[in-house]
């Protein structure tokens, strides 16, 4: 599928690093437009964090767009002030990358519409996109707020802190940020991290599993929210034994 979305230059994105581990980190799996589920899960996280002193970090692991029609409302929410006591960071997933490519060249990257993009555009009131590149771009410019575009274009690829690497799909745990490849971070196979020898751990989404899973080198938290109704988060704390999980599962 990735080969369908190479019709514009690579988008240069940041890779973030924190020198100090916060009091707690909460990471959220692939939301895919399910703003309703994210609101519920964020409330759980805020309630849990109320008893934890010190700064907290809330990381969304990418793929916040596509497949459901709550995308516009979700991005509005993410542009609002962070919850008290939290720093909220959204990483780029392959679906945000596809959307940005479409916005730059809608005719050349029209395949995005078949991978959930149509639902994203519907959330902005666009239910039919056709015409020349200039015509389509005009419709997109009218419908999608510039702050939403800027938000999507500015999403970082990854974040590292302590012994953890957070990325949408894959992060080579044996290599530094400077040796990572954007394509792998967005589209790679997370299972490749199982072979790492560095003693770090990848926290990722991208691949749907029935339940969140813990493996020696990685924690997987994409539980297919758009089709299962289950959105999952993991909490990590220094000195805490096992990670704690939260979800919208009834």
Model-derived features: positions:
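A general structural motif
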Residues: 22, 53-55, 85-87, 162, ...
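Acidic, His/Gly-enriched loop-helix segments that form or flank divalent-metal centers
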Residues: 104, 110, 114-220, 224-230, ...
């Amino acid at each position: 599928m990735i080969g369908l979305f190479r019709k514009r230059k690579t988008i240069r994105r940041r890779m973030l690093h924190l020198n100090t581990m916060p009091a707690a980190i909460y990471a959220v799996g692939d939301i895919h437009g399910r703003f309703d589920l994210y609101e519920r899960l964020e409330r759980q996280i805020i309630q849990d964090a109320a008893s934890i002193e010190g700064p907290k970090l809330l990381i969304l692991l990418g793929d916040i767009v596509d497949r459901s029609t709550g995308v516009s409302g979700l991005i509005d929410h993410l542009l609002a002030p962070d919850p008290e006591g939290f720093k909220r960071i959204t990483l780029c997933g392959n679906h945000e990358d596809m959307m940005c490519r479409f916005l730059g060249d809608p005719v050349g990257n029209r395949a995005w519409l078949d991978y959930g993009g149509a639902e994203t555009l519907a959330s902005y009131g666009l239910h039919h996109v056709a015409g020349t590149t200039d015509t389509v771009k005009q419709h997109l410019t009218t419908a999608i707020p510039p702050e939403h575009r800027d938000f999507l274009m500015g999403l970082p690829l990854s974040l590292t802190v302590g012994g953890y690497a957070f990325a949408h799909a894959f992060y080579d745990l044996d290599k530094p940020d400077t040796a990572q490849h954007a394509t792998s971070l967005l589209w790679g196979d997370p299972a490749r991290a199982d072979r790492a020898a560095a003693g770090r751990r990848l926290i990722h989404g991208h691949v749907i599993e029935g339940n969140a899973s813990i493996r020696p080198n990685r924690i997987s938290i994409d539980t297919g929210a758009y089709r299962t109704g289950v959105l999952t988060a993991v909490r990590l704390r220094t000195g805490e034994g096992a990670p704690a999980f939260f979800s919208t599962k009834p």
